[in-house]
Amino acid sequence: MDQSLEMDIGKTLHCLEVLHAVQTDSRTSGWYWGDVRGKAAVGVATTALWRRDLICSRVGPPPFRLTPKGEAFLKAHKKAWEAFLTNTDRHETLEHFAHALQKTPEVHEVRAAR
């Protein structure tokens, strides 16, 4: 596996963790922004998903929710999403979502540093 795909797979894993957390309302806003020790990559993933309009921030708990585009994205990749949630075919699932996320265009500009 080449290094760039390996890095994309790592980022993809964090993106999927963020998508899962958004659905389960299980994290604080600090976790999403990477303010929790050792979770800087989660902040990068949160920004990547926001820039693709798959999640949006909101006031109050939960700090993020799926957008209609995010819901459609997960529905379009339902089989792979279910495989991710059940931890089956982990590598194949991550490759699937790495390619799917790369094909999803960014619609928001980079946010200024917080």
Listing of model-derived features with the role each one plays in the protein:
Residues E17-T24, K78:
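Short, locally clustered residues in the helix-turn-helix/winged-helix DNA-binding domain
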Residues P62-P68:
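Minor-groove-contacting beta-hairpin "wing" of winged helix-turn-helix DNA-binding domains
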Residues P68-K103:
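Short, amphipathic alpha-helical interaction segments positioned at domain boundaries
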Residues I9-H14, D35-R37, V44, K78, ...:
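A composition-driven surface/loop motif
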